[in-house]
């Protein structure tokens, strides 16, 4: 299943015909050619507003030109705004990739606390847009895969693999609903993914709920880690309990 997590580009010159605008649009086009959606924003405004998109984005690219900086990093509005943006993003999301796009000398204006939070610095015109796009997409995909907890990731793979599901004889993976008009409506309303993912407590690809192995066992251990517990066990209400 292809989830919608665009790469967000924040650049005041995104639609301009200057050097910066042409460069960032070439990068955006290269990313779109690789199959990733781009959300281009042309106004910085309050960067903290864009930070709220951290749950919907697969990566952020912020374009900053060298001439935008003023003397003194402690009071520079660009540095202060960038720091506030990063702090707001990292407050809720420690892993989403953040890139700065700028000139070669732009990075010297940025203090270490900002540089530490970046996944990379993209030097304008130093590499081809196609290469930079592939690098950013690799990091974005790695981030999205890391977001998925063990069982959900295994369930996604199972549902996408075209595996026949006979675990629920009441609907047989949704097939039974396709035999009547109202069933078709039900199928279209809830979607095939929900019905194909309706499985029993013991699927080889997912693990055994009673034996705590496979993706189920891995998820139980992950849940125990999150809740700082010694053990965590999943149960379901039915014959398996």
Report residues per predicted region.
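A short, well-structured beta->alpha microelement
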Residues: 28-53
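Conserved acidic residues
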Residues: 56-59, 115-126, 130, 230
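Short beta-alpha junction loops
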Residues: 13-15, 66, 100-107, 127-128
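Alpha4 helix (beta4-alpha4-beta5 surface) of REC/receiver domains from two-component response regulators
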Residues: 72, 102-121
């Amino acid at each position: 299943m292809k989830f919608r997590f665009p790469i967000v580009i924040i650049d005041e010159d995104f639609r301009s015909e200057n050097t910066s605008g042409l460069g960032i649009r070439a990068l955006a086009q290269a990313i779109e050619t690789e199959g990733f959606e781009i959300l281009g924003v042309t106004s910085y405004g309050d960067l903290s507003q864009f930070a709220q998109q951290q749950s919907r984005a697969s990566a952020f690219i912020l374009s900053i030109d060298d001439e935008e900086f003023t003397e003194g990093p402690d009071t520079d509005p660009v540095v202060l705004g960038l720091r506030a943006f990063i702090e707001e993003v990292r407050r809720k999301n420690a892993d989403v990739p953040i890139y700065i796009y700028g000139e070669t000398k732009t990075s010297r204006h940025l203090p270490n606390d900002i540089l530490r939070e970046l996944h990379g610095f993209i030097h304008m015109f130093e590499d081809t847009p196609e290469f930079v796009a592939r690098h950013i997409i690799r990091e974005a995909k790695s981030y999205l895969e890391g977001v998925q907890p063990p069982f959900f990731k295994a369930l996604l793979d199972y549902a996408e693999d075209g595996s026949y599901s006979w675990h629920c004889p009441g609907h047989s993976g949704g097939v039974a609903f396709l035999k009547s008009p109202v069933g078709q409506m039900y199928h279209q309303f809830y979607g095939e993914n929900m019905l194909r993912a309706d499985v029993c407590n013991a699927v080889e690809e997912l693990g055994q709920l009673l034996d705590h192995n496979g993706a189920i066992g891995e998820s139980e251990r992950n849940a125990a880690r999150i809740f700082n517990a010694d053990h965590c066990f999943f149960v379901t209400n039915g014959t398996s309990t």
